[in-house]
């Protein structure tokens, strides 16, 4: 949703609104065809950042820096909760479910064992699925707002799940495992003819290196990577070492 709150030099009404879909389709107008085109193009890109922003439009184009005399447009990204699809209900999957719920994701947990896929074990999950990995992933609606992590009990189950998730347009796919093991899986699938570009999008080994050892710490490293990619972060420390001025 976009709306004008400072008209600037353009003959537009304050509060005029235009709805822009992720596809670029529009409903309504801000009152100026040129302004509509500029803002719509920027609004589509805002979906990728999942961010609400203010844009300033001048004769020279659009900027996010406050500019006196510009037409100011508020761009609000309205979308459903991102789906965090956890494949594997073990210790790491359980920790991920708790953390993803806390971070306001729609949490889905899949495991093929009843003892691991139940609401008593996963009370924070919005959906708990006990089914064959291949069948369940095939059925589940996956799109750019879906974040998938493979943390099953073994590399065989991870690879099976990865095969079904590839090429579905997920916003993120990650697979746990050592560098050696995951490299073997990727190489095997490459030799079988899977799209190299799709395989290159798989984050494996998964997570950010924070020295994680416990299931909770590993879950934190995985979620940190997801948030970094979702928000366009760098994972660099924001710590700044203060230095005393030289005497």
Residue ranges and their predicted role:
Residues 118-124, 186-191:
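Active-site-proximal loop->helix
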Residues 157-170:
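Rossmann-fold NAD(P) dinucleotide-binding segment
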Residues 1-112, 120, 129, 140-147, ...:
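Segments forming oxygen-rich coordination pockets for charged ligands
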Residues 152-155:
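N-terminal glycine-rich "phosphate-gripper" loop used for MgATP/nucleotide binding
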Residues 170-171, 176-247:
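Adenosine-phosphate binding glycine-rich loop
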Residues 126-132:
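Conserved SAM-binding strand-loop segment of SAM-dependent methyltransferases
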Residues 92, 157, 181:
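Hydrophobic/small residue at the entry helix of a nucleotide-binding pocket
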Residues 114-116, 180:
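Helix N-cap at the beta1-alpha1 junction of Rossmann-like dinucleotide-binding domains, i.e.
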């Amino acid at each position: 949703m976009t709306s004008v709150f400072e008209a600037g030099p353009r003959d537009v009404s304050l509060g005029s609104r235009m709805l822009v879909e992720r596809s670029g389709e529009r409903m309504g107008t801000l009152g100026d065809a040129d302004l509509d085109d500029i803002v719509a193009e920027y609004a589509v890109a805002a979906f990728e950042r999942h961010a609400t922003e203010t844009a300033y439009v001048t004769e020279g184009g659009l900027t996010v820096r406050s500019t006196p005399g510009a037409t100011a447009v508020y761009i609000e990204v309205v979308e459903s909760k991102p789906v965090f699809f956890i494949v594997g209900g073990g210790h790491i999957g359980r920790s991920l479910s708790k953390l993803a719920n806390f971070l306001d994701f729609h949490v889905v947990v899949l495991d093929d064992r009843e003892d691991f896929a139940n609401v008593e074990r996963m009370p924070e999950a919005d959906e708990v699925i006990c089914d064959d990995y291949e069948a369940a992933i095939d059925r589940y609606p996956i799109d750019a707002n879906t974040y998938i992590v493979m943390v099953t009990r073994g590399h065989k189950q991870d690879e099976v799940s990865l095969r079904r998730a590839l090429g579905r347009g997920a916003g993120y796919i990650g697979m746990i495992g050592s560098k050696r093991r995951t490299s073997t899986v990727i190489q095997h699938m490459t030799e079988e003819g899977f799209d190299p570009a799709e395989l290159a999008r798989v984050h494996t080994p998964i997570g950010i290196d924070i020295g994680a050892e416990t299931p909770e710490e590993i879950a934190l490293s995985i979620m940190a990577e997801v948030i970094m990619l979702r928000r366009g972060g760098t994972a660099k420390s924001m710590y700044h070492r203060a230095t005393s001025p030289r005497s």
